[in-house]
């Protein structure tokens, strides 16, 4: 009888899934905004928590890269989406971020009926239950996992782009508007991957 209960519990843990979604790069001035959606069973959420999965901002780059393959291996499914700097300038960062999330969700094999999203952003259009969680990447392993997948994916792109945009130290600032990055823009000019709508606010255009 006890073995049957344990077997039933194990099956339940393997079946129950949670879909977390998060974005990264929303505040950068260069390059796309990224989003990731990660599907996890209860069992694998527990395992990833033991590995140290938490909000990507609380982890070192090395730790994030070590956790990424574990997340991808233990996830039932995952998707990554992005919106370009041009789309951000055209649509605004809010709509472009929504679009990156929708694109990540469309990469999933099955459309989820329920999502948990980090922060207050409501996806439109999206038919299904959405739960918006403030600081969700610190509270839900699925959102934390999504934040790591999105962060490492975007950082990897920034490092690759450094070859063509070496005058902006993209590998170092990851596209964010550091004082050094802004100084290099004044010196070298604006590229097609800089978000012009953001730079206007900094009076660099």
UniProtKB/Swiss-Prot annotation:
EC nos? 3.1.26.4
Range of residues in the leader sequence: none
Q: Residues that bind a divalent metal cation, according to the entry?
A: 22-23, 118
Asked if the record carries the keyword Lyase, the reply is no
**Keywords assigned by UniProt?**
Cytoplasm, Endonuclease, Hydrolase, Manganese, Metal-binding, Nuclease
Q: Name one GO cellular component term.
A: ribonuclease H2 complex
The UniProt entry's GO biological process terms, in alphabetical order, are:
DNA replication, removal of RNA primer; mismatch repair
Catalysed reaction equations from the record: Endonucleolytic cleavage to 5'-phosphomonoester
Necessary cofactors? Mn(2+); Mg(2+)
What GO MF annotations does this protein's record show? manganese ion binding; RNA binding; RNA-DNA hybrid ribonuclease activity
Task: Report the cofactor remark.
Answer: Manganese or magnesium. Binds 1 divalent metal ion per monomer in the absence of substrate. May bind a second metal ion after substrate binding.
Question: Where does it localize?
Answer: Cytoplasm
Domain RNase H type-2, chain residue ranges per copy? 16-205
InterPro entries attached to this UniProt entry: RNase_HII, RNase_HII/HIII, RNase_HII/HIII_dom, RNaseH-like_sf, RNaseH_sf
A Pfam family name for this chain? RNase_HII
Family under the similarity heading: Belongs to the RNase HII family.
Kindly give the NCBIfam families that the UniProt entry links to this protein.
PRK00015.1-3 (NF000595), PRK13925.1 (NF010537)
Checking PANTHER family in the record gives:
RIBONUCLEASE H2 SUBUNIT A (PTHR10954), RIBONUCLEASE HII (PTHR10954:SF18)
The protein's matches in HAMAP family, at most eight in alphabetical order, are given as: RNase_HII_B
State the protein's purpose.
Answer: Endonuclease that specifically degrades the RNA of RNA-DNA hybrids.
Record-given protein name? Ribonuclease HII
The record lists the organism as Prochlorococcus marinus (strain AS9601)
Q: Lineage of this protein's species? A: Bacteria, Bacillati, Cyanobacteriota, Cyanophyceae, Synechococcales
């Amino acid at each position: 009888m006890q073995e049957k209960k344990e077997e039933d519990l194990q099956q339940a843990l393997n079946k129950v899934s949670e879909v977390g979604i998060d974005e990264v790069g929303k505040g950068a001035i260069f390059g796309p905004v990224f989003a990731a959606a990660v599907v996890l069973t209860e069992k694998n959420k527990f395992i990833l928590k033991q590995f140290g999965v938490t909000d990507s901002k609380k982890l070192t780059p090395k730790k994030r890269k070590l956790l990424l393959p574990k997340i991808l291996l233990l996830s039932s499914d995952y998707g990554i989406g992005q919106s370009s700097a041009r789309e951000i300038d055209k649509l605004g960062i809010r709509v472009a971020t929504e679009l990156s999330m929708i694109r990540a969700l469309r990469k999933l094999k099955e459309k989820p009926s329920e999502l948990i999203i980090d922060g207050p952003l409501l996806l439109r259009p999206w038919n299904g239950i959405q739960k918006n969680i403030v600081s969700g990447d610190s509270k839900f392993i699925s959102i934390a996992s999504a934040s790591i997948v999105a962060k490492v994916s975007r950082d990897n792109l920034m490092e690759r782009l450094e070859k063509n945009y070496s005058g902006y130290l993209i590998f170092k600032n990851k596209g964010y508007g550091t004082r050094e990055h802004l100084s290099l823009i004044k010196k070298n000019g604006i590229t097609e991957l800089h978000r012009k709508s953001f730079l206007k606010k900094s009076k660099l255009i």
